[in-house]
Amino acid sequence: MRALHFGAGNIGRGFIARVLLKSDFNLIFSDVDQNIINAINNYKKYKIKLIDNSFEKIININNISAINSYDPNVLNVISHVDLITTAAGVNALYKIASILIEGIILRINLKCKKPLNIIACENKIKATSFLKKIIFDKIPLKYHDYFDEYIGFVDCTIDTIVPTFSSFKEENSLFVIAENFKEWIVDVNQFKGMVPKIIDMTLSDNLTSFIDRKILTLNTGHAIAAYLGLMKNYKNICEAMSDFSIQRIVKDAMYESGLVLIKRYNFNKKDHLSYIDKIFVRFKNPFILDKLERIARNPLQKLSKDERLIQPFVEAMKYNLPYFNLVKGIAAALHYRNINDIQSIKLSSLIKEEGLEETLVKVCKLNANSNEIRIIISEYHSIIKDFL
């Protein structure tokens, strides 16, 4: 089978390509960075260093090619492939949507009746459905029936860490370091035609529960570790997780959010606690020096109502579950300052100009004078003296 992947960055090279090539796909990368395109087409291979807490190993990625996303020939590629994946960033989906429309219309003109499945592996809940909406808002009505019959828009959740790596050697320009752990869960009901056989891909008929499990465990713990670590001037996740006080808060916060998930989805408690332990061990991986500023960026998004911090805290209060450590993470996020992060600057200005309560109303969509706001404000002031 043939696959086209948009986004030749770390996730594309370190995760998606690894899985698809292992599953015997013929893979073509597409990207707007001509330097990466040239490197892929010149070398046609690269190495991935897989790392775990106790080992590391090198694997080879071979027989790859690439095409610039602005090259008109990409439409011909779209007209012939069986699978399209993306890991290019949410904002890139608007441009990708336009390219896909042209390529799929070419399939229609070629009278292609072969199903095409599209999976957007982006940092957004149900990113593929988001991409589908962009496409359907743009395409003429006369094409809707073809899209409905032959084009599958498959939502997914992915979980792996591929930290940023820079190399000054030309022969290593495609080299990536990737976590050995990987999880790719897709909605089995959204495929068109036969479901492709992809090694290490989990098929689910209840994707929402897996999405929430990841957001309210991995993302919650990751964010809290970052915001607490930055309060103590740590640089990367490994440094932060070497601090016992941060370890305790992060682990207990994931336990608190876990109780919310168990209540919501009736998860098996023993299994979910085992999942938390697995995530916690990954955070302490000494080989992954993921920068805290990267993890903490975009605090306005991370503090929004349905995101990793506010959602479990509000629901824990609703069900009379513990939230002591979750609120510490929220308070630490509100203290986050980074002059290179536009959202951090906006958050800081909002707190300074309109006060903390109004900020929580506007950013987190909490009700004014609510118990949630009262508890967060109290922790915001106490965490400085209690934690540092």
UniProtKB/Swiss-Prot annotation:
Gene Ontology molecular function: any one: mannitol-1-phosphate 5-dehydrogenase activity
Annotated keywords: NAD, Oxidoreductase
Gene3D superfamilies the record matches: N-(1-d-carboxylethyl)-l-norvaline Dehydrogenase, domain 2, NAD(P)-binding Rossmann-like Domain
Entry keyword NAD: yes
Catalytic activity: D-mannitol 1-phosphate + NAD(+) = beta-D-fructose 6-phosphate + NADH + H(+)
Enzyme Commission (EC) number: 1.1.1.17
Name of the protein this chain belongs to: Mannitol-1-phosphate 5-dehydrogenase
Organism annotation: Buchnera aphidicola subsp. Schizaphis graminum (strain Sg)
Gene that encodes the chain: mtlD
